[in-house]
A protein has these predicted regions:
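Hydrophobic/anchoring residues in structured secondary elements
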Residues: 8, 174, 220-223, 239
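Conserved Rossmann-like nucleotide-binding pocket used by diverse enzymes
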Residues: 7, 124, 155, 222, ...
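Conserved AMP-binding/adenylate-forming
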Residues: 4-9, 13-31, 35-136, 143-146, ...
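AMP-binding/adenylate-forming catalytic core of the ANL superfamily
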Residues: 100, 105-106, 128-215, 227, ...
Length: 250
């Protein structure tokens, strides 16, 4: 059959979504950008060696944000405290920063926000990520979405990735929920597939415990539709407010 080239963006595509699209005949290219960067800032340029990988491993490569888009002057993952590049080890987290003529000049009539955004001469995206050995960037989370639990940083995207691999999960989003003992713990909001029957919160939590370090598994699961923007992006700020209304873990 014919292969259809598709660009995806708005939010990082879970590997399960990429696998499903590839199986349907779509060749996926992942684009990343912000309003402030006037569209794509990075793209996950496919590499010839990926063709030899299994579909799951290939999807893991394709889900990364990738390399600098040709119209962008420069990108880097920097330590925001020292403004020095993080090592390309796939583990050390820094903030993705951009600069170039396609990046905005500033926020209208808001010089304080502009100065903060361009501290150190780079535009601070607010996205935390790593650089892999091949130079490809992978975003781990928005800085405001990182869950601080018992002194450990938990990436909400990593937990969501595990949830999307569950065969009965159609959509998922994870936010922090206050916890008397740990400070914060992951709270998962999940939309099940139409054919899902008798899937409980305990089933979802156990799935995560089987696929993640135990401390990263959600302690609470809320089922139902997820709030979205007109373009289909999940509105996590609404979910954070909903999580605040839930009884606090103790």
């Amino acid at each position: 059959g014919q292969t259809v080239e598709v660009a995806v963006g708005g939010a990082a595509p879970p590997t399960a979504v990429i696998v499903a699209m590839e199986q349907m005949g779509f060749r996926v290219t992942h684009l990343y950008g912000l309003t402030e960067s006037y569209g794509p800032a990075t793209y996950c340029a496919p590499q010839p060696g990926w063709a030899n990988l299994g579909l799951e491993d290939k999807a893991l490569e394709m889900a990364r944000q990738g390399v600098r888009y040709p119209t962008l002057f420069d990108q880097a993952v920097l330590n925001p405290e020292t403004m020095t590049p993080v090592p390309a080890d796939g583990e050390t987290i820094g903030e993705l920063m951009l600069r170039g003529n396609t990046v905005m000049r500033g926020y209208l009539k808001n010089p304080d926000a502009t100065d903060e955004a361009f501290s150190g001469g780079w535009f601070h995206t607010g996205d935390l990520g790593v650089v892999h050995g091949d130079g490809y960037v992978e975003i781990k989370d928005r800085s405001k979405d990182i869950i601080l639990s018992g002194g450990e940083n938990i990436s909400s995207l990593e937990v969501e990735e595990a949830l999307y691999r569950h065969p009965k999960v159609m959509e998922a989003a994870v936010v922090a929920k206050l916890d008397d003992k740990w400070g914060e713990t992951p709270c998962a909001f999940v939309t099940l597939t139409p054919d899902a029957e008798n899937v409980s919160a305990e089933d979802i939590i156990q799935w995560c415990r089987d696929n993640l370090a135990h401390f990263k598994a959600p302690r609470e699961v809320v089922f139902g539709p997820l709030p979205k923007t007109s373009t289909g992006k999940i509105q996590k700020f609404i979910l954070r407010e909903q999580a605040k209304e839930l009884p606090k873990n103790s």
